[in-house]
Amino acid sequence: MRNDLETLKHIIDSSNRITFFTGAGVSVASGVPDFRSMGGLFDEISKDGLSPEYLLSRDYLEDDPEGFINFCHKRLLFVDTKPNIVHDWIAKLERNQQSLGVITQNIDGLHSDAGSQHVDELHGTLNRFYCNACHKSYTKSDVIDRTLKHCDNCGGAIRPDIVLYGEMLDQPTIIRALNKIEHADTLVVLGSSLVVQPAAGLISHFKGDNLIIINKDRTPYDSDATLVIHDDMVSVVKSLMTE
């Protein structure tokens, strides 16, 4: 492990165009449940009697707007979550002008909360909301502080700005993410199993020097990586920052 940390530190210190690609594992230490792991959010919301895929779908929003709103308020608004050391480390490297930014599969908004400026949120963010009817914009604090569920302009359902099942990923976001990957000298994957498509397929566009994967479980890209660390990333980053 120590040799891996030394290698990781050397690569990070010698890189000036790092792109980060993050998944659910990054936010677990902040109290955000991993969607797909055993005991994760999908397991938990399955207890509601409807499939998680349906509850997080465009169809459910259209079939039962009130039910969809209530589900979002009950299950998705992580009020007390704060960035952890991994989010802070990524933001610090961006401030130090070593990083091109971060691409994330997460919807919790914690990268932005940590101070990262160049964040491509592939699946949207819970930091923004909008009316499903008239598209008036709302912030997360609007929704939480005022317990807003319906638009004060037209009465429509206020939905989070996330990509639901049955909706397409935002193409400008995909283009920005591809640009970050294609121009990176080092790509660091953190807390992602790299199996959810099409987002995970972006990794195949990396042509730089070093692919680093830090994840508890194996990924389909492990054999292509310069360095693979199967460990808790909070522990890895803490150790890295004390090296």
From Swiss-Prot:
Gene Ontology annotations for the cellular component aspect, listed alphabetically: cytoplasm
Binding residues for nicotinamide: F35, I107, D108
Subcellular location: Cytoplasm
Any one GO molecular function term: NAD-dependent protein lysine deacetylase activity
Residues the entry annotates as binding NAD(+): A24, F35, R36, Q105, I107, D108, H123, S192, S193, N215, D232
E.C. number: 2.3.1.286
NAD listed as a keyword: yes
Keyword entries, A-Z: Cytoplasm, Metal-binding, NAD, Transferase, Zinc
Ranges where the Deacetylase sirtuin-type domain occurs: 1-243
Enzyme class: transferase
Cofactor note: Binds 1 zinc ion per subunit.
Cited function: NAD-dependent protein deacetylase which modulates the activities of several enzymes which are inactive in their acetylated form.
The protein's name in its UniProt record: NAD-dependent protein deacetylase
Biological source species: Staphylococcus aureus (strain Mu50 / ATCC 700699)
